[in-house]
């Protein structure tokens, strides 16, 4: 039987926490193979341009005129704290958090960029917090937050089933964020993506007249 090998790219949150079930389901067929590259949005788009990927699932921004795309889902973005923190389960104002240590991903991270953009739109910046810690590992961030060292803002998928971590919300910060499936024009990538991810995603991809 002919084998089908997909070349998939994903940003870190999506590759590490969102696609696992889809990968398991897809590999349930003996004729299916895949390679998954987890990298930042910029590099994944470059790989699409060079035909090194069939499609990418990303949280970052991209040219909606250059690529075709569709919305995979809107992902909750949440504040996280230790389970026994007085912040846990509350709806807070940003002023309530400035005395905390803020733990963020490294420069260039999509998660960090989204948080910084929303902070700026609300009139704040990272240096308004008492202390800023930058860590590239989700595992380390979660361990420090669970240990009461500080707070962070991550996608819900990253902290699902984490019994030692609580969540909170903040107006203007913890709004859902889109995850998109992105692919080059004039390819069969949409069919491959829907075979891999399911075909019930919202159809918001860009259809040009010349396609």
Regions found by a protein language model. Name each.
Residues 18, 169-210:
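A late-sequence structural motif
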Residues 2-64:
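Central regulatory/effector-binding core of bacterial HTH transcription factors
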């Amino acid at each position: 039987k002919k084998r089908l090998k997909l070349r998939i790219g994903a940003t870190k949150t999506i590759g590490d926490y969102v696609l696992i079930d889809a990968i398991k389901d897809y590999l349930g067929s003996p004729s299916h193979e895949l390679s998954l590259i987890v990298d930042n949005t910029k590099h994944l788009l470059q790989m699409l341009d060079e035909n090194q990927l069939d499609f990418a699932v990303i949280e970052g921004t991209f040219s909606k005129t250059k690529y075709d795309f569709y919305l995979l889902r809107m992902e909750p973005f949440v504040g996280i704290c230790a389970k026994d923190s007085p912040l846990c389960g509350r709806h807070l104002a940003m002023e309530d958090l400035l005395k905390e240590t803020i733990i963020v991903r490294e420069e260039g991270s999509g998660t960090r960029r989204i948080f910084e953009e929303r902070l700026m739109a609300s009139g704040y910046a990272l240096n308004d917090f008492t202390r800023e810690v930058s860590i590239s590992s989700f595992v380390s961030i979660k361990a420090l937050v669970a240990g009461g060292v500080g707070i962070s803002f991550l996608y819900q998928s990253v902290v699902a089933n984490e019994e030692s971590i609580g969540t909170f919300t903040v107006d203007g910060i913890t709004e859902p964020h889109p995850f998109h499936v992105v692919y080059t024009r004039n390819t069969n990538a949409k069919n491959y993506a829907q075979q891999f991810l399911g075909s019930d995603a919202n159809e918001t991809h860009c259809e040009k007249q010349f396609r």
